[in-house]
Amino acid sequence: MQLSLKFVAGLVLASSAAFAAEDNVEINLQRRNSFFSTGNQLNVNAFTTHQSQVNNKYKDALENFKRNMGRDHPLLRLLLGDKRNNGGSGTVKLTDVQQEQLWAGDVSFGGQTFGIDFDTGSSDTLVNPKAYDPKKSKNSKNTHDYFRAAYGDGTTAKGFIYTDDFEIAGLKAKNVAIGHSVSEFIQDQEPSQGIAGLAFPSIQSFPKKYTPFFEALKKQKAVNSGVFQFTLKPGKGSTLVLGKVDSSKYKGKVTYVDVDPSQGFWLTDAKINGQKIKAIIDSGSTIITGPTDQVRSMVKGLKGMTPFSSGGTLMYTYDCKNTPNVSINIGGTDFKLSKSQLFFGHANNGQCVFPVAGQDGLPMEAWIVGDTFFQAVSIIFDTDKNRMGFATQA
C-alpha cells in the first residue's frame, strides 16, 4: 500500500536565505508498505522485527545519553544487556506475509535523492551504502568519525560520518552530518534507505559537534521557526510541516505541554485510560508499546481481551464487534482513539488485534506512543519553546 504524505515548508524569505524555494513546497512521501496481507491479517514476523528494532533503538539512545551527558537517563529501567523474556499467557497464530510499515519521504545529500524514514524517537541521519555516494558530491567531506548503531535483529548500521549539502522540500543547509553505513541495515524496504532523526541531540550517537538535520536547518535560518508538525492519516492528506504551524490540520484548541530537551526524547506525562505513564511521542514506532507489567495493568480494565505473545511482545485480541474504549490524556485533554485507530488487523481466528503491546526488556520506564496515536491528532513539535502541542485532527 502506498500513501501520499506531503511536506509543507515554512520558508525564510530574507535575502540571507536566497537559496530557499517558495512557500508551500510539497514532497510526496510514501507509507512504506504495510504489516497486513489481503484480509488485514497481521504479519507476525514483520511486526516482531519492528518491535525489536524499536527496543534496540531505545537501548542505543540510553547508551548515547550516558555518553553524551555523563549520567544515566532518568527513565532507565533495566540493565541494557538484559533481554529477559517474561512470556505471555497464550498464543494466537498469525498469518506471515512479507510487508512492513513506516513513513518515508525524499531528502537530498550532495545532490543525491533517496527515501528516508522520519523518526522523532532518534537523532541521527543514517543511510544504506548504496543510497549515497560521497564521491559523487563535490562538497562531501569524510570526517573520519566512526559511528555504530543497532537497528534490528542483529542488524547494525556502521561506518563513517560525512558532512554534505542537505535539502528537503526546497529547504537547504550546508555541512549536515550523514552516517554512511558500510553495511545494509535496512533490507528490501523501498522507498526508504535510511533514518532521519528528529529527537534532541543528547541521545544522538554522533559526536556533539554534529547537529541533527532539523537543528542545522534552524541554525542556518532555512526555516522561519523551529517547529515541525505531523498530521498522519490512514488515507490521503497526511503532512509533515516544517518551519511553521498549519492550523488547517486541526480543530479546536491546541494543548501544549513542556518538554525537557536535555532528556533527548519528546517526552511528556500522560494517562492511558486513567493510568499514569511517561509517554515518548515517536513517529518511528507503529503502535503504542509499554513495559509489560504496566500494559497488563491497563488491559485489566478492558473486557473481552485475549492475550498472546510473540518474540517477547505481549499483545491482545478482542471481538471486532466490541471495540474497547481507549483514551490518552495529555495536559488535561482526553484524546479518544476511534474504532479504526484501535484496529491493528486480524488474527486468523477472526478477532481484531489490539494496537497496545507490552514489550519484554524495554530499557526504560516509559511508553512509546507511535502511529496509532498520531492518526488521532495533529502534533506540533516546538524546538524554540521546548514544548509539544496536541489537537484533534480536522
Features from the language model and the residues they span:
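Fungal secretory targeting signals
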Residues: 1-26
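Non-catalytic N-lobe/flap surface of aspartyl protease domains
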Residues: 21-250, 296-329, 351-369, 393-394
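Active-site beta-strand/loop microenvironment that shapes enzyme catalytic pockets
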Residues: 113-121, 273-298
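Histidine- and/or cysteine-centered catalytic micro-motif in compact active-site loops
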Residues: 233-235, 243-247, 259-260, 270, ...
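Flexible, small-/acidic-enriched active-site or ligand-binding loops
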Residues: 239-276, 344, 350
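Generic recognition of flexible, low-complexity loop/linker segments
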Residues: 275-278, 314-316, 377
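C-terminal transmembrane module of eukaryotic multi-pass membrane proteins
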Residues: 335-339, 364-368, 376
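C-terminal helix/juxtamembrane-tail motif
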Residues: 381-394
